[in-house]
Amino acid sequence: MTNIKIILGSTRDNRLGEKVFNFVVEEASKNPNINVEGIDLKDYDIPFFNLAMNPTYMDNPGYTGDTDKLSKKIDDADGFIFVMPEYNHGYTGVLKNMIDTFYNEWRLKPAAFVSYGGISGGIRAVEQLRLVLIELQMVPIRASVHIPLIFNQIDDNGLLKEEIKEAAHLDATVEDLEWWAKTLKEPRESKLK
């Protein structure tokens, strides 16, 4: 079974991203070929990156606490979906810090994106994150979902509107991610032994 971790890259109070995150976790879980686990960064106390050396050059950085727990979850994954807002034409600082804290855990794994924001729907944040993930030897897939004007996409019950869910075509993105995760798994395990 393919393990997909869905990471919510916002920790703000009253964040709209939690609604998007719950939708993505629920929809991705409908795919019978993958195990899905949601990771809300708000649940982890990850200190600002402060290792003496870049984790790129370390086999065992000696993580403790929540950092160690998150390292194991990321290492266990075959692929990722980043659910993320756009802040000032970029992705969030909390997401950048979490990504930079790890290296080997990310290597040779695919990533998909579900972004949300104002008029752009978070596209600019995704474009920036793609560049960073390539440096980590990840494979950002082309398929992605962007939800514009997120503040107008919430219904009276505080949930993501049904028409937005249908228009997202998230299932196609999940299927692409599943294919990439399966395709990369054996070569990744062989190379990283």
Where are the predicted features?
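Alpha-helical structural signal in soluble globular domains
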Residues: F23-N31, T101, E105, V132-E135
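Rossmann-fold NAD(P) dinucleotide-binding segment
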Residues: T92-L108
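A short small-residue
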Residues: M1-I6, P110, P148-N157
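N-terminal beta1-alpha1-beta2 submodule of the flavodoxin-like/Rossmannoid cofactor-binding fold
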Residues: M1-M84, H89-N97, L160-W179, L184-K193
